[in-house]
Amino acid sequence: ICDLDIKNFNTDDIKYTTLKRSTLINFLKKDLGDIIKTGFKISKINDQEKQIKISFENNVTKECDYLIIADGVFSKSKNLISNNKVKPKYNDTLAIRGKLTKFPENVNKKNVALFLGPNFHHVIYPLNSNGDLNFIAIMKHSLSLEEQGNYSLFSENSFIKKILEKVPQEIKEYVTGIKELKIFPVFVSDEFLKIQNNNIHLIGDAFFAFPPSFAQGASQSIESAYELFMSLNTDKEINFFKKRANKLKMINFRSKFNLFAFHLSNPLIIFLRNIFLKRLVKNKKFLEYYLGRIYKTWLLDISLCLKWSIGTMLPLRL
């Protein structure tokens, strides 16, 4: 439909990048050593005392001044705090992810390619300097309550085959040969949880999970961690929730709108959408307003977070 040069959002030392999430995670944790303890399951959180008391399933109890909850969209810790009052909901979409072995002729291996279709969109982008390409697609698909809770369903060959048969005909050739294929349901947040104890904070998807359209999950997790770190350092943590909630409301609205626009099926509306897109990507004021407020903030906060946590800057390049 059109081209958008994401490098326009770069500065001299802060640049947009694409990479595999596991690569970023390994980079961030490589110098942490044994600081992170794993294998613990929280059974109870008592936040009524001056210090927060955390009970684990192995009968171990710990007390702490601050509790930072970052255990994802299905956060058990968040459920314990809210007494299961705040639950994510199924977004009526499935995500299909994998590494491409066959490359479409119209894909630039050094750029991000977004393809739009009725009730389906997919993105292809480089993972590394070796030319490996990642494939991620979002497909409209209804699931019953039973299917939503059946996690083994999404790895069953019969289910995978049924889903792949529904992808657009023009991409079936290279989707069928995908490596490391994963299909999973997309769950999103419906509301924010304001915790009364100002020493307990949510970050990442535990704070709020979006519909998938801005590729913002990992970026927002890093950004929220950095903002919380700065808030704690300056004794302004009481403002952290309000600041994050306001930012995330904006991103959530735009993510929902993008998903709607990406999945249009009416030919006339699609025709009009494509005309608007061709014009809008050339409008610097629109890009600055609609994308710049999100991407430039992400890039700045992520680069500062990486500098703080590792002591050096991760080389980022599109």
Model-derived features: positions:
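Histidine-centered metal-chelating micro-motifs
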Residues: 74-75, 95-97, 120-123, 207-208
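Conserved FAD/dinucleotide-binding core of flavoprotein oxidoreductases
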Residues: 11-16, 20-25, 60, 101-182
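Conserved N-terminal helical subregion
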Residues: 1-101, 142-149, 153-157, 300-318
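Short beta-strand or tight-loop elements
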Residues: 38, 50, 118-120, 182, ...
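C-terminal helical "tail/cap" subdomain of flavin- and related membrane-associated enzymes
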Residues: 173, 193, 214-219, 226-318
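FAD-binding beta-loop-beta segment adjacent to the flavin cofactor pocket
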Residues: 184-211
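Conserved protein kinase catalytic core
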Residues: 77-78, 210-212
